[in-house]
Curated annotation (Swiss-Prot):
UniProt GO cellular component terms: cytosol
Catalytic activity line of the entry: D-glycero-beta-D-manno-heptose 7-phosphate + ATP = D-glycero-beta-D-manno-heptose 1,7-bisphosphate + ADP + H(+); D-glycero-beta-D-manno-heptose 1-phosphate + ATP + H(+) = ADP-D-glycero-beta-D-manno-heptose + diphosphate
Known partners and oligomeric status: Homodimer.
Cited function: Catalyzes the ADP transfer from ATP to D-glycero-beta-D-manno-heptose 1-phosphate, yielding ADP-D-glycero-beta-D-manno-heptose.
Keywords: ATP-binding, Carbohydrate metabolism, Kinase, Multifunctional enzyme, Nucleotide-binding, Nucleotidyltransferase, Transferase
Matching NCBIfam families: cyt_tran_rel, rfaE_dom_I, rfaE_dom_II
Protein name: Bifunctional protein HldE
Example GO molecular function: heptose-1-phosphate adenylyltransferase activity
Family label: In the N-terminal section; belongs to the carbohydrate kinase PfkB family.
Its EC number(s): 2.7.1.167, 2.7.7.70
Residue positions binding ATP: N206, R207, K208, E209
Region annotation (Ribokinase) ranges: 1-331
HAMAP family listed in its UniProt record: HldE
Length: 488
């Protein structure tokens, strides 16, 4: 199995992992509008507000990202008895996958970060917050709830935004309890004194935070490694994962191993919350049994996804799979998409009046028979989507020695063909769910089927589509090719 295949499989294993996240919950508000003039009162732009949204921020965004990759997080935090606190509690409750343990502290100001945007450009951020440590009674409640949740957790995350939930006594105590229970601890740190996180498994400072915590220059790879090693030596961390914006990430481990991961983003729109995505993906991966380098690789890929979105965004599991495939692609890379993204593209095609076709198969060792069917399929429509069985699906259908080529390789070959407009990898034995989602106008299969035996034929016909049986090329099959290769 290739490293890529292993990572793709790892993404699936993120589902159902239990991660305990403790930290500062916030409310992220986004105000979108347009700017067409300068204020006569001062040399500042006038934002004409068009819409507003709100979502979980701070440690809450870590939890959102955990849910996005399929994890089942428990969330322990504190809010005030104010409107923002009630909104945070409501937003947490909207995610059925989250086990919420939100403690209300009377009189506390719930942190609100309000960002103003015009044409994807952030103009201003306005904060309302409290940085005071939570009271002793609240701290006792937090510890009681965490003690109950810790045994079930694969990993504990401390998401410290310096708003009081993880003030020194509680951070130290939580790490002590987690280590005693044999749990890994990931810390997204705040401030300059990292000794309060001593004994944590991994800390994830950005470049600026690393400089402030160590006082060292962090411009080059060598300087970043030296500063990270200082933290490892002084605080007993197993590893430091440094996020370095356009320079990617650097993982430095106590055993001396170093991994430099290049930035994955193609275009950066907004870095809001990217650090939360890194922490969440890293935690879910470690909870699933991944090694630190594997987990860091996935976290780096996830960060590249979210900075390409506007606002405090998340990276979904299917987006991770697509991004992993793209690492090895040269031609047709934009053609390989998850079914959710394919549905959006198909909708755009339909609005332009284009007829959408669909065919599917394993396409292991592409041969003239495959090429002929794809050409006939494209001839029956304007845009052709190819459903591709995943490696696991092919193995169930064809046996333990198949596929010969990985799903990444098969998708790459298909996407390089001019007849193919999109490739969607599916893990089920049949493409029925994909067909139901995309609702193609034309469904194409080889003439070795009859229409009543074609999976999805009744569905396509139910919405007025048609089923086309493509002519076969005699003697062409992957099985025959494999037999010839084996001398049979």
């Amino acid at each position: 199995m290739t490293e890529l295949s292993a990572l793709v499989e790892r993404v699936e294993k993120l589902r159902g992992t239990m991660v305990l996240c403790v930290g500062d919950a916030m409310l992220d508000r986004f105000v979108y509008g347009s700017v067409e003039r300068i204020s006569p009162e001062a040399p500042i732009p006038v934002l004409c507000i068009e819409r507003e949204t709100a979502m979980l921020g701070g440690a809450g965004n870590v939890v959102r990202n955990l849910v996005a990759v399929g994890a089942e997080p428990a969330f322990v935090s504190v809010v005030g008895d104010d409107t923002a606190g009630r909104e945070v509690t409501r937003l947490v409750g909207e995610h059925g996958e989250i086990d919420p343990c939100i403690v209300v502290e009377p009189g506390r100001q719930t942190t609100i970060k309000t960002r103003f945007f015009a044409s994807h450009q952030q103009l201003l951020r306005a904060d309302r917050e409290s940085r005071s440590p939570v009271g002793e009674a609240i701290r006792a409640q937090l510890l009681t709830r965490i003690e109950r949740l810790l045994p079930k957790a694969g990993v504990m995350v401390l998401s410290d935004y310096g708003k009081g939930v993880l003030a020194e006594p509680i951070a130290i105590e939580l790490i002590r309890r987690a280590k005693a229970a044999g749990k890994q601890v990931i810390v997204d740190p705040k401030g300059t004194d990292y000794t309060i996180y001593a004994g944590a498994t991994v800390v994830t400072p950005n470049r600026k935070e690393l400089h402030e915590a160590t006082g060292q220059a962090v411009d080059s790879d060598e300087q970043v490694v030296a500063a990270a090693r200082q933290l490892i030596d002084s605080c007993g961390f197993e590893a430091v994962l440094v996020t370095r914006s356009q320079d990617g990430m650097t993982l430095v481990r106590a055993d001396g191993q170093i991994d430099h991961l290049p930035a994955e983003a193609r275009e950066v729109f907004d870095v809001s919350g990217a650090g939360d995505t890194v922490v969440a993906t890293l935690a879910a991966a470690l909870a699933s049994g991944a090694t630190l380098p594997e987990a860091a690789h996935l976290a780096n890929v996830a960060a590249g996804i979210v900075v390409g979105k506007v606002g405090t965004a998340v990276a979904y599991g299917d987006e991770l799979v697509v991004a992993l495939h793209r690492e090895d692609l040269t031609l047709g890379e934009a053609k390989i998409v998850p079914v959710t993204a394919a549905a959006e593209v198909v909708d755009r095609w339909r609005r332009k009046g284009q007829k959408v076709g669909f065919t599917n198969g394993c396409f292991d060792l592409l041969h003239p028979g495959h090429v002929s069917i794809l050409a006939q399929a494209k001839g029956a429509c304007d845009k052709l989507v190819v459903g591709l069985n995943s490696d696991a699906s092919v193995q169930r259908l064809k046996g333990p020695t198949r596929p010969v080529q990985s799903e990444a390789s098969r998708a790459t070959v298909l996407s390089s063909l001019a007849t193919v407009d999109l490739v969607v990898i599916f893990g089920e034995d049949t493409p029925l769910e994909v067909i139901g989602t995309l609702k193609p106008d034309v469904l194409v299969k080889g003439a070795d089927y009859t229409i009543d035996k074609v999976v999805g034929a009744d569905l396509v016909q139910s919405w007025g589509g048609k089923v086309v049986l493509a002519e076969l090329v005699n003697g062409q099959s992957t099985t025959n090719t494999i037999k010839k290769m084996n001398g049979n």
